[in-house]
Amino acid sequence: MAAAVSCFLLPDAQAATDGEERTLTLAEVIGMAQTESPDAVAARNTYKSAYWSYRNYRASNLPALSLASNPYLNRSTDYVTMGDGSVSYVKQNNVKTDLSLAVTQNVWFTGGTFQVSSTARRLDLLGTRSTTYNVQPLYLTYQQSLFGYNSLKWDRRIEPVRFREARKQYAETMELVAAQASNYFFELASAQTNLEIALTNQAAADTLYRFALGRYHIGTITENELLQLEVSKLNEEANVLSAQISVDNAADNLRSYLNIKDEVELTVVTDDSVPQFDVPLSEAMALAIENNPDIEYMKRQRIQGESNLAYAKANAGLKANIYLQLGLAQTGDDFQKSYNDLLDEQYVSVSLSLPILDWGKGRGQVRVARSNLELVNTQMDQRMIAFEQNVQLVVKQFNLQARRVDIAHRTMETAAHRYDVARQLYVMGKSTILDLNSAISEKDSAYRSYVSSLATYWRLYYTLRSLTRYDFEHDMPLEYSYSDIERN
């Protein structure tokens, strides 16, 4: 069945749409949607954001090399407290320059930060030509929280899951875009079908009315039956106008979704055949659990809940931070000589904080976090059940839909044949107008049901692909070019 109906347009309507026409198949619409539609563009940008967030996370676990300098000029008057308690004002007139090179590495399993640095400083006293140097050729620094929340460890568990979720979410969205594009495609196909039906019925009603006029004049039908045919003719004319508006609206919706800027008349052509294959439920379920982003989302929510509980526990008890620093340093009036006879330097700092009386605040925060974790686990269990039920439902519906398409097609052909027979019988005066109207109604309903069954088939087809990230028709996984998005 060809759903394109431009050749059926009334003369007035045809004159109004004599511009460029573009006929699209379902495959062409889906290809354009996955490239140009707002949903596809949003999906690419969402994935790109997730990709760079993950890159930033991975970079935070690698050694970082930095160069720092903080030169300043100081010309001011400052006071100095003398030994007897008096205050003396001293004029400051100096320039300080420094340069520091440091390598910093986060240590995820302890949550600390390790740094190796080398620093050189120069102090010039203006007006005296006095210059001194302070060098620290090698300095090692380590700091961490001893009993606190280790964000590095939890990020190591959460961020890879978040990125896998983003990759799978992009794949799912591309298939959902295909499903949405098929909805717009069949919305236009259905509107075109209704217009084709309306045009056919209008032509038939006009022919029957003209034929009935002749029969009325020779007295073989009543005036009531003639008026009934005239009303039917007028109704069909109104139906054509309504159907044309529906076609225009559906075409505008499709044009908008495909981001087509040109003013072209869009028509779509449906294919009678649909792929004939069954999907094993067990295989679909296993693939859905492996490939669907919802599974990664549920996993991430559970880990996030555990992380929140660990954070609450860490903040409720003893907090301790340690800062260690050791290295070599020296000062002198000559830069090169400053590196001679280097002195050892060590610095150790430990800070402690223990809540003595917080009126149960810390314990309450732990209980809230634990309750939230239990709630998340319950919600994720229910979400998993709903997910599995949805997969089962989609698979069962899809496995039946090809048969339904075949039944709808045969019903459409049978109803069309019945209409032809009923029309001939009415023309021959062997049936009533009620029988003819019934045949017309069944023909129209069967035609619409067939297009609707095709739309349902392709919606289920792409929904199943979105759930499993698998092409069951060709028995192969769906692949997407992530690298092209990551490079842009």
Ranges and model annotations:
Residues 16-183, 320, 324, 360-363, ...:
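Short flexible linkers and secondary-structure junctions
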Residues 1-21:
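Bacterial Sec-dependent N-terminal signal peptides
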Residues 41-45, 58-59, 107-132, 146-174, ...:
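Sec/SRP-type N-terminal targeting helices
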Residues 30-34, 86-88, 221, 226, ...:
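Amphipathic alpha-helical coiled-coil scaffold segments and their short linker/junction regions
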Residues 49-52, 57-59, 206-210, 234-260, ...:
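Short segments within alpha-helical structural elements
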Residues 14-20, 66, 73-75, 274, ...:
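Acidic, low-complexity, intrinsically disordered peripheral segments
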